[in-house]
Amino acid sequence: MKTPVITRFAPSPTGFLHIGGARTALFNWLYARHTGGRMLLRIEDTDRQRSTPEATAAILDGLAWLGLTWDGEPISQFARASRHKEVAEELVARGQAYYCYCSPEEIEAMREKARAEGRPPRYDGTWRDKDPAEAPSGVKPVIRIKAPLEGETVIHDRVQGDVRFPNKDLDDFIILRSDGTPTYMHAVVVDDHDMGVTHVIRGDDHLTNAARQAIIYRAMGWDIPVMAHIPLIHGPDGGKLSKRHGALGVEAYRAMGYLPSALCNYLARLGWSHGDDEVMTTEQMIEWFDIDDVNKGAARFDFQKMEALNGIHMRQMDDEALFGIFIATLPHLEGGQAFLDKLDEKRRGQLRSALPGLKERAKTLLELLDGAGFLVAERPLTIDDKAAELLDGDARAMLATLAEEMAGLGDWTAESTEAAVRNFAENTGRKLGKVAQPLRAALTGRTTSPGIFDVLAVLGREESLGRIRDQAVEK
């Protein structure tokens, strides 16, 4: 029977869930879902100075917002310190590790000597074969692994291929500090083994760690998980991703109005592809994703592409689903809470009606909010500078006449108001734009909006006529 796939996402809670971590989580999640397996979550909180509960909460919130649900309870690495110590001591008992009593000064002297001789600054194995009886009194030792002295360690990587590390470069690294706490290198191996992790999918900046971790696995006689080291995300110029180029936490993307489904789609395409498909649903990504198809080369982050993709997702999304996400996101958008506070039941209905037109003109929820502002604007409207230019004396006089004609309409719909405005333009010898543009300025305070007849229908007779008359003057 085939062993079920178990992946894991293991962030350090020292800040928000950044975009690179989000993609790593996504790849782990997609592969687990694709294979019918599980994705576990481990919080690597052993750095007590930098790890905070707030950062842990932010990471969990970011994953939940993206829809990357984990299986089981999150595991705290710090809480497993006694288990890490137990395995380190077992390695000593097996003869695969040893106590080292070197002082920091002695270690530094070794490194200086190695540098002077043109060798890498490595620990020289002083205590590797020493009799523990020679241990100095009053000195708390560290535990070091007995790394192989010759040959090479080969990592069979699903993305990078076979990667070879000369064992002479790996040295006898520390697995347990003198205070009894584990090093990252050791804790990761013990946790992955105990959690039953079958596939380790992480950034290729961890590739050198894989060689050292393989030594611990072999020393314990444990199976080494399948390794897949995915390329890092670079900026548009090919350099390290900076905040200016997108190296932000996912909460920043929520505040910029990106849909979680669109962000996941974009992140999946950074380093992985499925033919020429650019726009994918979550279900399609789960069906198509395979870790073997991830590219070795670094992917370049492009804000414009992501924004365009977000716009496509918004336009393709069911209106009711988009309405729900928009309402839920409003508290995270600049000006969104104030908009939300004004959304009574009537205006919620108006927003639902306006959504088809609004989403055609928006690439983000922030732009959608901006476009929807006219719905909650208080009379008399604040008119922006461009719109004010359209409302000269002739235009205002025209609006007064138009308001009187439209007041007599029986039905007030997009179709009936369009017919009335077109008739008015024709009867007064004006082009439609010469009527519609000042009308838009009066109704929304701006020069851009959804279709003007949709705006009239959404606002309704009373509000529309009130706004037109506010900007009109009698002849």
UniProtKB/Swiss-Prot annotation:
Single GO MF descriptor: ATP binding
Biased composition (Basic and acidic residues): 116-133
One GO BP: glutamyl-tRNA aminoacylation
Cited PROSITE patterns: AA_TRNA_LIGASE_I
GO cellular component term of the entry, any: cytosol
This protein's UniProt keywords: Aminoacyl-tRNA synthetase, ATP-binding, Cytoplasm, Ligase, Nucleotide-binding, Protein biosynthesis
First-listed, main subcellular location of the protein, grouped into a coarse class: cytoplasm
EC number(s) recorded for this UniProt protein: 6.1.1.17
Binding-site residues, ATP: K243
Motif 'KMSKS' region, chain ranges: 240-244
Pfam families, per database record: Anticodon_2, tRNA-synt_1c
Compartment annotation: Cytoplasm
Chain intervals for the UniProt region annotation (Disordered): 116-137
EC supergroup of this enzyme: ligase
Task performed by this protein: Catalyzes the attachment of glutamate to tRNA(Glu) in a two-step reaction: glutamate is first activated by ATP to form Glu-AMP and then transferred to the acceptor end of tRNA(Glu).
Protein name stated in the entry: Glutamate--tRNA ligase 2
Organism this protein belongs to: Chelativorans sp. (strain BNC1)
